[in-house]
């Protein structure tokens, strides 16, 4: 479990570095130099010392999502949602995928906070309503991030539920700290 800290939250370095892999799969053209050129000095410095097991700022995470989306000519929200789905597929080991498949969407829902803490050192993701084909979850105590982080989380949850056997997953982000709400809240419905 990540150490909690005061101040703006951070995300695990492997998550930020995975965005580079995702960008590479979006285009046959090498885009990395173009993206690095768009970084400001602070982003370049932080990225140069980032390690998979270290923590990176949400600022860098957001910057890489925005510059990556621009490089592949994608809407940032569409790009962020697709990255969230890519991340859960990439980071979920085969055996865990099988456990999710046999455990069904309910297991995915029960594991949400453990999954959250794997990637973030701030906030908690808790399910507060669970029905047979729907669930609602809340991210509380989030420090930092951006609206694109919220989109990544939605894509991650949606794809995680699909990997767990849910079909026709519909996600909504009903409340958002970046729109002035106290917490972020997500609702998922599936067949």
Predicted regions and their residues:
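Amphipathic interaction/junction segments at domain boundaries or subunit interfaces
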Residues: 50-152, 175
């Amino acid at each position: 479990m990540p150490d909690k800290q005061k101040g703006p939250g951070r995300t695990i370095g492997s998550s930020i570095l995975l965005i580079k892999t995702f960008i590479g799969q979006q285009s046959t053209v090498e885009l990395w130099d173009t993206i690095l050129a768009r970084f400001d000095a602070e982003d370049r410095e932080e990225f140069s010392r980032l390690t998979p097991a270290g923590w990176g700022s949400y600022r860098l995470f957001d910057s890489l999502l925005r510059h990556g989306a621009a490089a592949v000519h994608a809407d940032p929200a569409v790009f962020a949602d697709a990255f969230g789905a890519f991340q859960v597929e990439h980071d979920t080991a085969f055996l865990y995928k099988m456990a999710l498949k046999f455990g069904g969407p309910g297991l995915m829902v029960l594991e949400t906070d453990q999954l959250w803490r794997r990637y973030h050192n701030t906030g908690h993701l808790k399910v507060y309503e669970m029905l047979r084909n729907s669930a609602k979850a809340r991210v509380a105590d989030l420090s930092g991030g951006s609206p694109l982080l919220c989109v990544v989380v939605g894509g991650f949850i949606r794809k995680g539920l699909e990997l767990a056997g849910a079909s026709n997953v519909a996600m909504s982000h009903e409340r958002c700290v970046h729109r002035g709400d106290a917490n972020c809240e997500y609702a998922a419905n599936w067949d």
